[in-house]
């Protein structure tokens, strides 16, 4: 509004023929029908003009507001500081914008988003104040509702025990909750969310790729991490795609979607640990039975091994005597006694062989070597504590599956750990440390079991794998079948086992097994 139109009225004026004389009327009608409430006041805030939107929002008619002060709209709850800021800006001949709590004629309240600007004459003096405001009560309510919902959602997400993370197409972390950050500190060395995302992608493999490429959700995908000296972690992972419309202006009429990935990770370690404890109790009974059967097999095989020699000697002597006696062999009492002894010996060998407990055939299945090692360490805890042995276990964080028999591989590890404990239990061994590690090397799963015992002499590193050969004193139990059994099991899994001759501070047994191509 300019001083060119000092007389303000709500009455329409008749248009003139000349276009220059139409402009003030057009301008007045424009202000009158503007969708925003407009009022013009004198320097004391007395209302000189109010347009239709002003009357609609406030509920006052023209005759009720003209000449009245703008304070008739005040509810008295707006802080005085706001008004001081308003008049301070106007005194500087600068516009002011802010929000006031106004009151309508019917006493209802509304939020007025107000802009007040000084109207200056040609001399730069303020002659009027122009006020424009709109009712933003509904918008404010919606904004507050959205903000409150955001705060509630954030509170729920932040308090949730499940770890949550939102990723963009480049796998960058867009949003994560405190549980995810704590999980990152527990699982990855640098404790960063990005490193944990990379680890999850690697372990989830196919489900993550399907989610990323096709948007197909997955649920209840379990992964586990062995952390060496700490308890293992079992995680149940869920993933889904979130489709969000592009926010940029140039796609307003042709909106496009951006795909984000939401991962939710539940820590089920406590549940799995309880299940694992129950399983270990059953496993103890099973392995005790297997050890009993293995002891029986060892005893029978040792007896057969010992008896086979004399029987073979009798048979050889009998054949020599038969050739020497020729035709008189049939009546020779010594030869007859030898035949009876040979027959009795062969029958005894057959009976012993038939009495050996038969090993049950195992079906091949994917086996996690880290899990078997942890089970064996748990089963041997009492022995390790009794001998004062410190265990240092360094498992690979992600180890491929090994196809084969779970029970036989567990038995193989148990034999090696038992041998290490036996070796370090000698009185002259003061430093008692058992080091176990797993890693992937040359497309093989490599397991090293190292003890600080007296070690194996270089000239015996091959002989120790022979059946019934033992470096233990005669009075010690277990006469030389541990490593041969280990070698047999490893060979059945197309692997290799050997003694590391370069290691001089004890004994290091190295087992290498091929892993499944599908992992």
Curated annotation (Swiss-Prot):
It comes from the Bacteria. GO terms for biological process: nitrogen fixation; phosphorelay signal transduction system; regulation of DNA-templated transcription. It catalyses: ATP + protein L-histidine = ADP + protein N-phospho-L-histidine. It is an enzyme of class 2 (transferase). It holds the Pfam family HATPase_c. The keyword Nucleotide-binding applies. This is Nitrogen fixation regulatory protein. Its cofactor is FAD. Its EC number is 2.7.13.3. One of its GO terms (molecular function) is ATP binding. Keywords: ATP-binding, FAD, Flavoprotein, Kinase, Nitrogen fixation, Nucleotide-binding, Phosphoprotein, Repeat, Transcription, Transcription regulation, Transferase, Two-component regulatory system. Required for the inhibition of NifA activity in response to oxygen and low level of fixed nitrogen. The modification Phosphohistidine is found at residue 305. Residues 94-148 form the PAC domain. Residues 23-93, 151-217 form the PAS domain. Residues 302-517 form the Histidine kinase domain.
């Amino acid at each position: 509004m300019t001083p060119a139109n000092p007389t303000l009225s709500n009455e329409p004026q008749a248009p003139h023929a000349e276009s220059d004389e139409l402009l003030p009327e057009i301008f007045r009608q424009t202000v009158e029908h503007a969708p925003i409430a407009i009022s013009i006041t004198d320097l004391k805030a007395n209302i000189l003009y109010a347009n239709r939107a002003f009357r609609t929002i406030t509920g006052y008619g023209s005759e009720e507001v003209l000449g009245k002060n703008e304070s008739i709209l005040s509810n008295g709850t707006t802080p005085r500081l706001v008004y001081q800021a308003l008049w301070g800006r106007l005194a500087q001949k600068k516009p002011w914008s802010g929000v006031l709590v106004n009151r309508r004629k019917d006493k209802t309240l509304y939020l007025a988003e107000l802009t007040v600007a000084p109207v200056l004459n040609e001399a730069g003096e303020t002659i009027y104040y122009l006020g424009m405001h709109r009712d933003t009560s509904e918008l404010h309510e919606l904004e507050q509702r959205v903000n409150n919902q955001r705060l509630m959602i954030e509170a729920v997400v932040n308090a949730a025990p499940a770890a949550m993370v939102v990723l963009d197409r480049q796998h960058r972390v867009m949003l994560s909750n405190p549980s995810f950050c704590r999980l990152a500190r527990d699982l990855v060395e640098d404790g960063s969310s990005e490193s944990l995302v990379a680890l999850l992608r690697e372990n989830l493999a196919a489900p993550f790729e399907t989610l990323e490429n096709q948007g197909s959700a997955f649920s209840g995908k379990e992964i586990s991490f062995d952390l060496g000296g700490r308890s293992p972690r079992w995680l149940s992972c869920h993933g889904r795609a979130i489709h969000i419309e592009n926010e940029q202006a140039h796609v307003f009429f042709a909106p496009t979607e951006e795909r984000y990935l939401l991962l939710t990770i539940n820590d089920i370690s406590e549940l799995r640990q309880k299940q694992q404890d129950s399983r270990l109790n059953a496993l103890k009974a099973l392995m005790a039975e297997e050890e009993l059967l293995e002891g029986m097999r060892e005893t029978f095989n040792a007896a057969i091994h010992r008896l086979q020699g004399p029987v073979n000697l009798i048979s050889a002597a009998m054949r020599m005597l038969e050739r020497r006696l020729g035709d008189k062999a049939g009546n020779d009492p010594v030869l007859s006694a030898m035949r009876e002894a040979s027959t009795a010996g062969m029958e005894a060998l057959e009976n012993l062989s038939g009495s050996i407990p038969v090993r049950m055939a195992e079906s091949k299945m994917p086996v996690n070597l880290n899990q078997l090692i942890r089970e064996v360490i748990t089963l041997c805890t009492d022995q390790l504590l009794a001998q004062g042995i410190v265990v240092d276990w360094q498992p690979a964080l992600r180890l491929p599956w090994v196809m084969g028999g779970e029970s036989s591989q567990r038995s193989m590890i148990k034999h090696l750990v038992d041998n290490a404990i036996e070796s370090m239990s000698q009185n002259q061994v003061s430093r008692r440390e058992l080091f176990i590690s797993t890693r992937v090397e040359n497309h093989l799963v490599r397991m090293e079991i190292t003890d600080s015992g007296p070690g194996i002499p270089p000239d015996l590193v091959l002989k120790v794998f022979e059946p019934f050969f033992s470096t233990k004193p005669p009075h010690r139990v277990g006469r030389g079948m541990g490593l041969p059994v280990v070698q047999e099991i490893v060979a059945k899994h197309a692997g290799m086992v050997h003694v590391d001759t370069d290691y001089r501070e004890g004994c290091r047994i190295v087992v290498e097994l091929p892993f499944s191509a599908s992992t």
